[in-house]
Amino acid sequence: MPEEKIVCQNLGHVYPRGKIVALENVNLTICSQEIIGVIGQNGSGKTTLVKHFNGLLKPTSGKVIVEGNDTAKKKVQELAAHVGYVFQNPNHQLFAKTVEHELEFGPTNLGLSREEVEERREKAIEFFGLQDLRLSHPYRISFPLRKLVSMAAVYTMRPAVFILDEPTTGQDNITTRTVYRLIERLREEGSTVICVAHDMILLAEVVDRMIVMRNSHLIADASPREVFSDTELMHSTHITPPQITSIGLRWPGFGEKKVLLSVDEAVTAINSSNPPANS
């Protein structure tokens, strides 16, 4: 049975400056080995929501429970062992002189032995394919690779939950596909992954559930297929489904409306609706 990792109970948050209501009455449960997508327009509350998961923000009302810990009673440093946050811009996260040193910082702060620190560093280098970059300065490598280093730095902390803020922003196609595979591998290792993203292809092809935010409220919690097929929801949130999904819903060649999430699904649908002629 899936283990509950994060539970939000009637969560509300008001920013003191300007008394802006950022979250209102959010109820949500996220379990082990789920891949979750969080979407919504700017200002909808999605970033405010996930910053409660690692204690960067504290509830104004309600509760957030992370692996049995009430976040209101825990310091950010304590929650870092449970939830790792990878920022959208790696420049806000990286500071060491080499990739190796960057990957050693987190586990060293956890008080691990030198042997354990080196073991975690080497595991991260292997997992993220950073062998040729270990002695490079993080700011002297490309932006896409820098984002992988920032993910690897969080990986060395071994959190149960990873929060990835726009993980494919600024990535080329090759590195984007690498990120997709890494997210799947994190799940295979037992992690829960939460992606705050505008990348609809990532959400369609990789995540299990989509959390849709609008005007400080959680308005939908469903599979990508259910969310992308809800035209009223898409319209009200000003979100555009992946192009292949829009084609499937509109193209009469399939014989019926198809909620397609990938090109592979489109190929299968086309082949099944147009069987080869008998020779």
Segments and roles (model prediction):
Residues 162-165:
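Catalytic Walker B motif of ABC-type/P-loop ATPase nucleotide-binding domains
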Residues 54:
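Helix-to-loop junction immediately C-terminal to a conserved catalytic motif
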Residues 39-41:
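The feature captures the beta-strand-to-loop junction immediately N-terminal to the Walker
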Residues 2-8, 13-25, 73-75:
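A short, flexible loop at the N-terminus of ABC-type nucleotide-binding domains that lies
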Residues 115-133:
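Conserved ABC ATPase "signature" region
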Residues 215-216:
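Conserved ABC ATPase "signature" C-loop
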Residues 62-70, 79:
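Conserved ABC transporter NBD signature motif
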